[in-house]
Structures are given as structure tokens and as C-alpha cells.
A protein has these predicted regions:
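Hydrophobic alpha-helical core bundles mediating ligand binding, dimerization, or RNAP-core interactions
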Residues: 21-28, 49, 65-69, 103-107
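Hydrophobic micro-packing sites on short alpha-helices
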Residues: 24, 52-53, 136
Length: 204
């Protein structure tokens, strides 16, 4: 496998979303552990995480997922080093996930080491739709087999990326990453991003 580009999901891949969930729990008038319990139910049932509000019998905050930007302190400790290391291999590095356009502005403002920054808002389609991954390949300007997609969710990242012909890399952290086992379709599975560049360099 001769990779030319590696694209990264955002939430729970590069960014620890704990602060984000706490903020929305506060806006909904709920304790954080109540939100996390409901989130666990949606993961176990294979539901979209937006269903958690229905399980709790409350309306989502009006600003749900649209006006809260990340902070540089939300990045996982290994995120920047990983992006830089992958870039150091001579590979194109991209960041694109199911995010509002505000994420793109944040990533550029923080000068994250990526050659391509986009979002589902800009692409006009969300994961796990196959078209999302086809557009990722277009952004990479190479063949699908030359692109890797790194994400924490088996259902939204790993399986659909593999089905679209990309190398699918599973990072096992965050709620989904810890509860969803790495499937056979994954090219590689990791508990963090610290050793990703070395693993990519050793791929045939």
C-alpha cells in the first residue's frame, strides 16, 4: 500500500470533546454524567448521538453543535505531534469530519499542521455517507487506495472508509473508540496517535 494522503476525523480523534459535552450538559440543565449515560445508550443501540436528547426527554440546546468552537487545549496531547510526524513522511495531511464550518476557522486560526482543512458543512454531506469519503479522495487528488482515513468510530469512520476503498485506521479512544471493537476491515488499530507515523512508514 503506497499512501499519499492521510485524513483525520476531528472529535475524539484529534480533539477530546469532554469540555464540549460538559458545556452542552450545562446548557440543557443536566449533569454531565447524565449526558454521558444517555450517550452510552445511543452507542450501544447503534443510534445517532443526537438521539440522546430524546432518551432524556429534553430538547437539545438551540445552539447544539453549531456555535461552539474548540479550543487549542481541547486537542489530545499527541494530536499536533502526530500531524507533524505524518507530514514529515511526505504525506498530504487533511482534517475533515462531521463538523460545522466553525471548526475549519478554528483549525486555520490555530495553524494546525494540515494541508487540507474541510468539514461536512463545506462538503455538503456527512459521514457515514459514501459520498463523504469520495469527496475526501477528491480533496487528496489521488486514488482512493492511496488515502487513509483516521477516526474513532467504527460505524462512521472505519467501515465506510474501507467500503469506499480507503485505508481505514481506527483510534480506540473516546466513547465510541472504547466501546466499538476494531473490525477486520481496519488497516490498523491504535489506542492513541503517538505511533501512527511509524506504523504508516512500515506499511508495504
Amino acid at each position: 500500500m503506497a499512501l499519499r494522503a492521510v485524513f483525520f476525523d476531528v472529535g475524539e480523534t484529534l480533539v477530546d470533546e469532554e469540555r464540549w459535552w460538559r458545556l452542552f450538559a450545562e446548557r440543557a440543565g443536566l449533569q454531565p454524567h447524565v449526558i454521558w449515560a444517555a450517550l452510552g445508550v445511543t452507542i450501544e443501540r447503534g443510534e445517532n448521538h443526537n438521539e440522546l436528547w430524546g432518551h432524556l426527554g429534553v430538547d437539545p440546546p438551540s445552539s447544539w453543535a453549531n456555535d461552539v468552537s474548540y479550543e487549542v487545549g481541547d486537542l489530545y496531547p499527541d494530536a499536533i505531534a502526530c500531524l507533524e510526524s505524518v507530514r514529515g513522511l511526505g504525506l498530504l495531511v487533511g482534517i475533515v469530519g462531521n463538523q460545522p464550518a466553525l471548526m475549519e476557522h478554528w483549525a486555520r486560526t490555530e495553524a494546525l499542521p494540515a494541508d487540507v482543512i474541510s468539514s461536512s458543512a463545506s462538503l455538503g454531506v456527512k459521514k457515514p455517507d459514501r459520498r463523504f469519503f469520495e469527496l475526501v479522495v477528491e480533496l487528496a487528488e489521488c486514488a482512493a487506495s492511496e488515502v487513509a482515513y483516521v477516526g474513532d468510530r467504527v460505524d462512521y469512520d472505519v467501515l465506510p472508509a474501507a467500503a469506499a476503498g480507503l485505508a481505514a485506521i481506527h483510534v480506540r479512544r473516546g466513547p465510541w473508540g472504547m466501546l466499538q471493537a476494531t473490525p477486520a476491515e481496519a488497516t490498523i488499530g491504535f489506542d492513541d496517535l503517538a505511533s501512527l507515523a511509524d506504523a504508516l512508514a512500515s506499511l508495504p
